[in-house]
Amino acid sequence: MSTSGATDGMILVPDPADRDDLRTLLRRILRLDEAAVVRLTSVDEGRMRVWARTPFGALAVRVLRGDCPGGDVVCGADHLLTELDILPRGDADGALDPGMPLLSAWQGLLPPADGFHPVENVPAQVLLDLTESGRTAARENAGPAGLPPSLLDQVALTVRADTDAPVGIDMRTVFSLVMCGFVPERGGKAPEGEPVRVSERGAWLRIDARYGTVYRRTARKRRRYRLGENLPPER
């Protein structure tokens, strides 16, 4: 795919289906945060990741076919959505102007690309049910400052619960995954047997659904010392 001439410095999404997927993602992100920025990074030839930080504190990402200038660009989600809306559907290049560079508006590091270890698969319906319960609780408990942190920080689901290293998934992660549209559903029901995969690497938790992934950085695990074992010296 050429990025020379008229398409220099442009985001290229040539397939109308991928543009539709990008448009849907941007609309969902803007519904959560009208001032959201998105970060596009290259995966390999002809594919890119579209990142957004949700207001719940998790990172959402979807892989689409396309190219981004320099392999890494940050732009306003509303600007990119406008670019998509004015682009003719039959446009062959799918060239989108990223607008003014906004790299300084992106906060935080991106997670590692690989090295995650599988923890457990969870039925997607469980995540949908938790989201509906969370929405009900939010309507009942939201105040002038928005949702109470106690609701968002609540561990909604524990996987690998029968081991000495359980993994807790909070409502921030659940809300981010479902509200970004990553879990397929119709009328609040996921396809029968639809899985969501949970994996981890160090302090990073990763949740993969059919249409996208959510990452959440958790508190680093502390080593547990057995009775009688020497503790490290105080610093």
Language model regions located:
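Long, compositionally biased intrinsically disordered terminal regions
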Residues: 89-235
